[in-house]
Every structure is written in C-alpha cells, then in structure tokens.
C-alpha cells in the first residue's frame, strides 16, 4: 500500500515526526508532502493561479510553500506521475484537537478533504494537548498517539463500512485513554469560543503610515451539552473518531423553507 503523509503544522513539525515513526514499516511506500511553515487554521484554501514553490527533500518528500490543501494535492499529483495515486492519505498528527466548531477551520482536516475530494481515502489525526502550547516538544504530549494511532488506522482500513466513503477524523486525548468512540462533531450553541485573550492588538507606525497588527489566540470549541459529542467524549478520555462528509446543509432550516414552496 502507498500512503501519503501531510499536515498543517509544517513539514518539520513534531507531529509529522511522530506520524512518520508510527507508520514506519507498515506500508510499502511512504511519501510526505507538507507545508513549509505552520498553516494552522488555514482551512481548505488552495493557491489558485499562483505558482507554488516546492522543495524536494528526497525522491518522495516535498516541502510545499503553500497551504495544507496545496500540499495534499501536490503530493497526490507527484505520486500519480509515478504510475499510481496513493491508496491512503493521512493528515497529521495535529498538535491540538480538531472537534466541534474548529473542524471547518482545521488545515489538518482540510488536507484530508482535498484528498477525499479527488477520490483518495483520507484520515485526519489530531492530538489533544493539556493547554500549554510549549508542551509541543514534550514526548508525553504524544505518547497516546504513538500507542494508539496505527492500530486504529489498520482497523479502519479493514472496515468495509468505511472503505474511503468519507473523511475519518481521529482525535486522541491527552489524558489516559478510556477506549474508542465514534461520534459526530458538536455544534450546540451556534458560536465559536475564543479563549482569552482572544487577540493581541498592536499599533505600528511605519513609513507608509499607521497600521494595526492583530494576533489571534488558539481557537477551541465551546463545551457541548451533548455528552455523546466529540468534544465531550474527548474530554472524558476517549479516542474519538468522527466521519466527515461533503454536505454543509442545515437540513432542519431547508425543510422549513421547502415546506413553504
């Protein structure tokens, strides 16, 4: 089986290094195509009509000066040019959970979606952290992913119910793992929570006049009232697997308007 690894945290991120270690020896070919820098929250942006500089680190490794979706598509194109597209794309391992309202913003899930859009089975993997971003390089932040991810990927590949019919998003807890649960993503209250301080505002005076610079803090999903949602189950210590499809339709509202026609 030929597999492509990608992410949104960047080619040289710790999560990519962990993912490489996890899949080592389990696939016939492993390719890597990932952004040159951290592209967290880049969502599904593609660099349309813009040349995308790509450095080759090896015959099967590409550092892409573009978005996560760019990286996935370029990796698939490179693999296809050798005679066969990948059998699987794995995006991650993201540093931080992707649950609830963070899902549409996630570059990790977007890279998987770019693969899924062109017919390649895709899995996105995210590792919850304990609230301190500086723990990125601490091995304990990744131990649950190291222990659990490959077994779960193998399970999905054997599962005829999935067979690449949707994106599979896996969130791994920071705390002791209580088991594996399948769940939808939480979207209870209609609003995103920005943990404070939500942004840092700086005024800058330069040669071209007065400017304002903003730096957004991490975005997290609000606490869900649904105990069976991805956010709640992750907080309870479960590895959460969420099937994600194409549709963004609000069917409840659509049904009401269709009833008036």
Curated annotation (Swiss-Prot):
Chain segments annotated as transmembrane: none
Signal peptide bounds: none
GO MF annotations in UniProt: 5'-nucleotidase activity; metal ion binding; nucleotide binding
Required co-factors: a divalent metal cation
Keywords, ordered alphabetically: Cytoplasm, Hydrolase, Metal-binding, Nucleotide-binding
UniProt key word Repressor: no
Record keyword Cytoplasm present: yes
Cofactor details (free text): Binds 1 divalent metal cation per subunit.
Main location: cytoplasm
Catalysed reaction, written as an equation: a ribonucleoside 5'-phosphate + H2O = a ribonucleoside + phosphate
Family: Belongs to the SurE nucleotidase family.
Function: Nucleotidase that shows phosphatase activity on nucleoside 5'-monophosphates.
Record-given protein name: 5'-nucleotidase SurE
């Amino acid at each position: 089986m030929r597999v492509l690894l990608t992410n949104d945290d960047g080619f040289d991120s710790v999560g990519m290094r962990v993912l490489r270690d996890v899949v080592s020896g389990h696939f016939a070919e492993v390719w890597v195509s990932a952004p040159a820098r951290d592209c967290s929250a880049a969502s599904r942006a593609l660099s349309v009509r813009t040349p995308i500089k790509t450095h080759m680190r090896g015959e099967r490794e590409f550092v892409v000066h573009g978005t996560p979706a760019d990286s996935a598509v370029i990796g698939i194109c490179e693999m296809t040019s050798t005679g066969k597209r990948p059998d699987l794309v794995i995006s991650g391992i993201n540093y931080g959970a992707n649950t609830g309202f963070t899902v549409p913003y996630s570059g990790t899930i977007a890279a998987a979606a770019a693969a899924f859009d062109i017919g390649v089975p895709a899995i996105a993997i995210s590792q919850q952290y304990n609230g301190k971003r500086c723990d990125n390089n601490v091995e304990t932040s990744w131990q649950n992913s190291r222990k659990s991810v490959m077994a779960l990927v193998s399970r999905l590949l054997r599962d005829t119910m999935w067979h690449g019919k949707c994106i599979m998003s896996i969130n791994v807890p920071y705390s002791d793992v209580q088991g594996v649960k399948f769940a939808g993503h939480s979207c209870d209250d209609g609003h995103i929570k920005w943990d404070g301080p939500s942004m840092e505002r700086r005024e800058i005076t330069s040669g071209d006049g007065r400017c304002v610079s903003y730096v957004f803090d991490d975005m997290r999903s609000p606490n869900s009232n649904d105990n069976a949602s991805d956010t709640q189950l992750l907080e309870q210590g479960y590895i959460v697997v969420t099937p994600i499809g194409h549709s963004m339709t609000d069917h409840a509202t659509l049904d009401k308007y269709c009833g008036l026609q």
